[in-house]
């Protein structure tokens, strides 16, 4: 197995940084769209281990990447808890009966029953990890982010229902978050048992919170998960809070080994605020791939020059969030080729 990605979490400064791309197995690739067309709905595809493996392999077959990520979705846990999940074109994920009260929370399945409904994810991890020659990243949504969808019923611009519950009924909110955290610990450990070499916690909506509420309603539960996972097995864990650059000083002392960085700050700024010891992952603006070949190469060169100037810390080159569906696959090749060229 190529171990450059895992070596980034070691103490030795690497000669060159590893690279992978968030949502690297996705709609921007025509081969992904061909597989997706075979299934009536998205979750049916996620439940098919062979299909998950096939689409996880697509970017590895196209590009020189140092890691793969299991093909799945962050909302597998809420669905396993008994919530009715549908993916609606033009809207995205929708829960038909959002959590609004203690009664709704009481309807959810137990942790044991919920975990038993997630075997298809572990099968996808096992099938994929046994096929590839690079590390496989497992993942989950943060409890706060999962709760956002479970309470709102779908994505939202303002998340009024979510934030209302946080302020008006914090006890109920914490009850939901704790249950999600307890399930997530087992979920991640099972992914590791199945073959994941690293796990990532995607805190997509943590960035909407004020600092104190981020600490109490989001980071607290990510840290709880990380500590409990590491008590069982010492595996690299990456925290990524989208829009979370204001929280770096809080994250830097937590149990994660890596921190995802979006494009709202430079890597230099992020390193200054996080300090030494943690791997930084990111932080290209996904939209930079709309640019010309020359502009892509210039942006890559600037980041690689900074990474190489830091003699103490390692970095994982990535986008600051998932790749957009309408990105030209050839632009991705330009980016990766430039990363390899300027890192040589």
Curated annotation (Swiss-Prot):
The keyword Cytoplasm applies. It comes from the Bacteria. One of its GO terms (biological process) is protoporphyrinogen IX biosynthetic process. Its EC number is 4.1.1.37. One of its GO terms (molecular function) is uroporphyrinogen decarboxylase activity. It holds the Pfam family URO-D. Belongs to the uroporphyrinogen decarboxylase family. This is Uroporphyrinogen decarboxylase. It comes from Francisella tularensis subsp. novicida (strain U112). The lineage of its organism: Bacteria, Pseudomonadati, Pseudomonadota, Gammaproteobacteria, Thiotrichales.
